[in-house]
Amino acid sequence: MLDGGKINKYIAIENHPDDFILSSGMLFINNKPDTIITVFTGDKKDKRTRILCKDYNINHIELNLPNISIKDGINKLVDEDEKKLIETIKKFESFEKITQMGCGHPAHLWTSNIIQKNFNNVIFARDFPHSYKKKNKFECFSNNYINLISISNEKLFDEKINLFKKYYKTQRALLFFDKKYFDLKPSEEYYKINNNKKYFG
């Protein structure tokens, strides 16, 4: 588990290209994962995380599950998609695992629920910026989790945003539409499941 903001050997499961850097970029800067698994790419031409991993000599796996929007819900996903995610993660049994908690986007919640049901000792990062929007009621959502650590450093936050700008140029509109959340320069928060209140969505 996280010890002083570092993990010895871990994989990162991101929902979409950019989710790992946005939610865990400060961790990434000082502690690179062995592998990043990108779940929802939809378009196989999407090379954003692929290029990041190549530059930093990190293994990268793209599951190419269909992109789903908040409007779509999870109706596009089938049992084979769930099986594909589980079987891929099982290949890294000896590794620590980090993913997003699932607050604020149905795709994030779908992934989080499956990981909770099938794997132990997973670290969940607070979704940025989704979980900071009032309608997502993070305080209620987070009752199912126990906080492990927060990484707070304005300089590191700026560095992770520079990474975001460099590798995820097509997503830079977030810096405008969600500006007030970026201006907060919030800590990165990491949690584990509260086994007394296990949540499956």
PLM segments and residue spans:
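Active-site beta-strand->loop->alpha-helix modules in alpha/beta enzyme cores, enriched
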Residues: 1-120
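The feature marks non-catalytic terminal segments
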Residues: 2, 48, 55-58, 72-77, ...
